[in-house]
Amino acid sequence: MLGYGMYYNIVKGVETDLYARAYVLEDDKSGRKVVFVNAEMAFITIAIKRGVMKRLERKYPELGFAEDNVFLSAQHTHSAPGGYSHYGLYNMSTPGFVPEVYQYIVDGIVDAIVRADTNKQAGSIRIGRSSFAIDKEVAFNRSIKAYNRNPEVKTAIAEEESYAAVDRNMIMLYFEAKNGNPIGSVNWFGVHTTNISNDNHRICSDNKGYAARYLEESMMKKGHPDFQAAFAQGPAGDITPNWIVDRKKKWTRGKFEDDFESAKFNGKIQYDVAQEATDNAAKQEEIPAFIDYGLAFVDFRNVIIDPEFAWDDKEARTGPACHGVAFFSGTKEGPGMDPVVATLATTLARGIKTAELAKAKLSKPQIAKPILDKYRIQGKKDILVEAGECKILGTKDIKNLVIPNWADPAVHAFKKFHANGSLGNKPWTPQTLPLQIAVIGNIALVGVPGEITTIAGQRLQKTVADVLGPRGVDYVLITSYCNAYCGYITTYQEYQAQCYEGGHTVFGEHTLGAFQTKYKQLAIEMTKPFNDRQQLKNDQPTSFSDEELSKRSFNIRTQKRLIQIDD
């Protein structure tokens, strides 16, 4: 499975089916259309987006879809199959790329898009709103220490009041046919889809999947069997559904000891508020019939930060992806490496930093500069993995890494793939990412290729709203896990705490500033006439050959480690 990064978190059965829900929106006047997809999986990868586009363009060119107007998102369940990224790091616990899983996902998403386009009909869109009462046990901030560092937080919030460090609002797009019959809805609320823990072996759509089922079943009882309900993610980076410390498991859980019951409990709360948002939407005016979209590809290895977002750092920029010890240590709801090993890793990381900085002092400028830049850009992070430069603990000689194979099966897999040459010299995680904005009436959907924290999401919303507000955008909705996955996006202040989220904010302490800089640039282009816009696609993500992938593929039909489906 994908999400927890644990080698033992493998599939042995199926608890719920997994769905991709697609919504095609078309403006008859301009002829423009956009498709929004929400899939029950951990996150969209570049490989999945490319696979979907390749099939749509080859098999269904008449539908008029291109990468600019196809908006792929995921609801982030950690209990769905993994192995569908072409980048090495995200497949290490699988272990490897799994062609069958990749193909099933691509086929399912394409089928959903084609069905949605085939069944489209004249209708309207309304906005519904609701919120979670403070006593509803639905979401909690798992990184209060980092959250409280933000200047937006005027009074520090105590750990036991972490429910207050959450955006408790839900916003919905409600789709209605011309005859008044409901067609479907998409709502946004940020909370991790992690009620089901890393000791699970059954495929499940988790809390948001149950919420979607409850709303669809409710609509079916009202005579609307084709109603589709997507529970999409907002800024969920630091938000968990778990708050009770499980003494047996040594991590936090939801309402009940049975994780599936906790997921249903949380899903029911989300469903109840979604039902309120549905009722609210029915009372609202239709939004304007207008469609627009924009897409940019950005190489995040060297983004110069707009001074507006640089926090007085005149040299603020990003660098190649680095993962910190804090990332590998995990969270309250999903622990990572053993604390003793984490302490050792921290000591090694700091020792390597000292040695490299000493080397820089004695080296020529062309050798010293990359070293000095790395540690300045990454700030307080204790660097364990340099995914952008293909290093672990400062070395590219992965197969001879000092960490023994028995210490971590994922490390064993890394060594194996390095030895057979399948990792090559290409980055282990995406360095070039797609940024997407879709405008639907007076709403802007911002597709973020990663996990953005609560306050970081608010800042990004404001950045886009400041540009697109004057052209009629009243709402900016952050949609996480879109089109690709780069890890986390914390604020500059949160990053300094180096909690899990900061350790997984890979492009350095100014990562959010880089996203604000580039989304602002994309939004500015979208204020121009459609045909006068600059194409922001010179940078493209890394491509991998079939030969490279075959050397690190895990084929579920041929490998000795068989996946047994028991029902």
What are these regions (language model features)?
Residues 1-567:
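Non-catalytic substrate/cofactor recognition surfaces at enzyme active-site rims
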